[in-house]
Amino acid sequence: MSAIITIALSKGRILDDTLPLLAAADIEPEDDIKKSRKLIFSTNQPNVRLVVLRATDVPTYVQHGVADLGVAGKDVLMEHGYDGLYEPLDLKIATCRLMTAAMKGAAPKSGRIKVATKFVNIAKRYYAGKGIQADIIKLYGGMELAPLMGLADEIVDIVDTGNTLVANGLEPREKICDISSRLIANSASMKMKHASLQPILDKLAQAVGAE
């Protein structure tokens, strides 16, 4: 009997982009994930089930082996860290950029600066790497408001079109990295369940390459 494989999926935009890739890999939920209030879904493959989580929780579930595979944004993975995780595939979906931003036309501030972000670990590493002393302020959303209200000199946030920044009088400054969603695997699962996981990885790789 094949080992049960649990795949953790991120809610929202990433989920919408992930389902067609799973379908191309012959994995389809038996219920409509987008409409159902359930969080655990059986699939057309008797040994594969899907769980739908907050994006920031996906690496934790995979890291602890509760899920064997997961789909999460590179930003979430960089913030969480890779302990116990293996990243076999860039799914090339939900693409965007992680950038710094500040008030439009504002001169770069010398000395210690204040930075608002939900990506605290990434921001600490980024500014330290540039030799800039930065006080990092943790926020959970609405980053654009921080410079407007004088809470922060800069923000670190995900930028797609940049329209929200412009609408609030901000401008992007420096790109930290390009972001896309990645397939991650529990390191122990890759060894213990290799025979069951590798065919899924191969089919997903083919699906990504065919896009």
Curated annotation (Swiss-Prot):
Domain of life of the organism encoding this protein: Bacteria
Swiss-Prot/TrEMBL catalytic activity: 1-(5-phospho-beta-D-ribosyl)-ATP + diphosphate = 5-phospho-alpha-D-ribose 1-diphosphate + ATP
Keyword Transport: no
Keywords: Amino-acid biosynthesis, ATP-binding, Cytoplasm, Glycosyltransferase, Histidine biosynthesis, Nucleotide-binding, Transferase
SUPFAM superfamilies in the cross-refs: Periplasmic binding protein-like II
Primary location group: cytoplasm
Localisation per UniProt entry: Cytoplasm
A GO MF term: ATP phosphoribosyltransferase activity
Keyword Transferase in annotation: yes
Extent of the signal sequence: none
Annotated GO biological process: L-histidine biosynthetic process
InterPro entries: ATP_PRibTrfase_cat (IPR013820), ATP_PRibTrfase_CS (IPR018198), ATP_PRibTrfase_HisG (IPR001348), ATP_PRibTrfase_HisG_short (IPR024893)
Entry GO terms, CC: cytoplasm
Pathway: Amino-acid biosynthesis; L-histidine biosynthesis; L-histidine from 5-phospho-alpha-D-ribose 1-diphosphate: step 1/9
EC number assigned by the record: 2.4.2.17
Assembly behavior: Heteromultimer composed of HisG and HisZ subunits.
Comment, domains: Lacks the C-terminal regulatory region which is replaced by HisZ.
Homology family: Belongs to the ATP phosphoribosyltransferase family. Short subfamily.
Free-text function comment from the UniProt entry: Catalyzes the condensation of ATP and 5-phosphoribose 1-diphosphate to form N'-(5'-phosphoribosyl)-ATP (PR-ATP). Has a crucial role in the pathway because the rate of histidine biosynthesis seems to be controlled primarily by regulation of HisG enzymatic activity.
Entry protein name: ATP phosphoribosyltransferase
